[in-house]
Amino acid sequence: MGSSSANKKHASTSSAPSNDVRAPHADTNRLLNDMAPQLMTPAMMNAMARISLQSTPIATTRDPFPLQRATLLLAPRFSMENPARSLARISSSLLQFSGLSKHSKSGREQQRTPITSMDVGVLEESQRILATADADLDASLDTSLLDDDNDTSDVAAAADAPVSLFRGYKATVPQVSTSKTRRRQLQASENIRRSKHEPHLLSLQELEVQDRDMLAERRNLEIRRALYHAEIVHVDAKIAALEATKASLQQKLLHVREEELELDDERQGVSELLELQRHRRAMPGGRGLDAGTVLPIGAGSSRWRKTPVFLPSEHDDLPHGIAFMSLNLETGPITALDFSEPYGTLISAALEDTVRVWDLSTGEDVGRLRGHTDTVKCLQVEDELCVSGSLDSTLRVWDLRRVDAFETACRARMEGDGQDVPEADDPCIRTLAGHSRGITALAFDHETLVSGAADKTLRQWDLETSQCVLTMDILWAMSNPSTSVDLRVPLESSAPLLDPLHGANQFAGPFSYPQPPYEDGSWEMYTDFVGSVQFWGFALASGSGDGGVRLWDLRTGQAHRTLLGHTAPITCLQFDDTHLISGSLDKTIRVWDLRSGHVLETLHYDYPVTALQFDSRKIIAAAGACAVDVYNRTSEKHSSLIKHGHTAPVERLRYMDRYAVTGGRDSCIKVWSL
């Protein structure tokens, strides 16, 4: 009994100082109690101890100077840059110097020791570090952080300021609700102690304590808000980086798609040459013939085919998007042009000038094609043949192989020889007459020629006999919409300015349309009722002044469909197996689906469109500006050909693979590498 009472007395006397020591550190104890469920789990303590042992070896024996050792471990500045190492140092300190660590002794693990004054030292050291971290954070943050009127600037300033590990952890531990509960419990206990008649007022000291608590909580909230803002900024930066990476990958994907299209076109060309070679080798006496010797009859016009041309190797060394050759006529605006192949023969026509022949490999003026009595409005070159249409209502077929000899004979006659030029040397081998007014559009393919004129008719010609075999009346097609218009084609919400369904009478007389101004402000009356024609096999497409694109059957001469959508005269068109692309004075280019008759895409410009050409990758357009527009069909982006280019609006162009020729109102012809 005596010993037990003595022990109880000794226990009570020994615990009293411990409580006295712990009393000043009540806040620290609460902090550690809040941290304990997350930090002081066995798995967490073992993991952090292993990390600490890897970075800072700890002696296996108890340190004789525990507080000094704890100071050395805990003194380095803690930050959010390496929280794992910082937590490991705290855990190792607590494990080693609070008696919670396990040391191997005689093959047995030492049991957990009771809390001693050494724990108080660690707690005191932790409290000092927390106080130091608070002071550093308060010094680094702007004092305006607590001003409610500057919340936005406060968040930005707090996000840039460094936050220590302990300060950030202390701020992020959910103590707000705990503090609220503690304050409410305190107020409730005070209310219980007071009588009902006493005023429910807290003392000055209690109010000051609560004010300090709330101020500390407010700082913690500001820190948490700053940390969340910093995380959001970090996430935004990652999102921006991912978006940039995505854009880069999409651009690479577009390049791959363009390369695929180019490879498909080249493979198509090789396949056709291979088929031609096999065909010729199978013919009697064709063993020694090469595929490139001559083309078979009906091989198709290179003007409208998508197969690329294999250019000379020096073309690859030319700067892309720059005019590398300029041909000056100094006679007037270019009215028509075409070339046989890259670095081949170019034929050009200008206002009030004869048709000229150029050598594109040297840029020299080779000769003239004499015979027309008025301006040539359209022409086309295929191999050694050229067909031109003029306002003199005639079509002429030229043999370009005779140009050199004819020019030599003409020069000899001019020099005074007095000899007549032999008729056999005349490049004009046929003259086709039949239209009653000027010819403004044509297309030919070996034995067949189709022309359109201001007399509002389309004519099909046999080049072997020079006879017109079919006449198609556009006015008749306009007057009979039941046979010429596909009523399933939806009209746009805005009615066309020109009504091709009910306006045949308004086109009975001479046609003229006020052309919208070009980039330089110039304009004129547009008088070409037939703006463009193209055919392939028995399929013929025409664009006319009424704004309609008509599809004809050359076997019957009937228009079986009209594509409606343009609100001004059609100036140019081209089609392939699936698409038809048309340009108009209404400042648009429309891409049509030939299977459904619907508009797939509409390109808008600032000025009227006068010429276009396309392949599977690009649409090249002359749209009333000095620059030539290049539309990438894969990336859906526009670019311009302007360097060393025209000084007046471009009106005519021809494009083949990566080689383009343009003519403008500045009387110049430019050759481009694309």
Curated annotation (Swiss-Prot):
SUPFAM superfamilies: WD40 repeat-like (SSF50978). WD repeats lie at residues 329-368, 371-408, 434-471, 519-562, 565-604, 606-641, 645-674. Residues 1-18 have a biased composition (Polar residues). Residues 1-25 are annotated as: Disordered. Keywords: Coiled coil, Membrane, Mitochondrion, Mitochondrion outer membrane, Repeat, WD repeat. Pfam families: WD40. It is found in: Mitochondrion outer membrane. InterPro entries: G-protein_beta_WD-40_rep (IPR020472), WD40/YVTN_repeat-like_dom_sf (IPR015943), WD40_repeat_CS (IPR019775), WD40_repeat_dom_sf (IPR036322), WD40_rpt (IPR001680). Residues 202-260 form a coiled coil. CDD domains: WD40 (cd00200). It comes from the Eukaryota. GO terms for cellular component: mitochondrial outer membrane; nucleus; transferase complex. It is a peripheral membrane protein. Gene3D superfamilies: 6.10.280.220, YVTN repeat-like/Quinoprotein amine dehydrogenase. Involved in mitochondrial fission. Acts as an adapter protein required to form mitochondrial fission complexes. Formation of these complexes is required to promote constriction and fission of the mitochondrial compartment at a late step in mitochondrial division. PANTHER family: WD REPEAT DOMAIN 5B (PTHR22847:SF637), WD40 REPEAT PROTEIN (PTHR22847). Belongs to the WD repeat MDV1/CAF4 family. This is Mitochondrial division protein 1. It comes from Malassezia globosa (strain ATCC MYA-4612 / CBS 7966) (Dandruff-associated fungus).
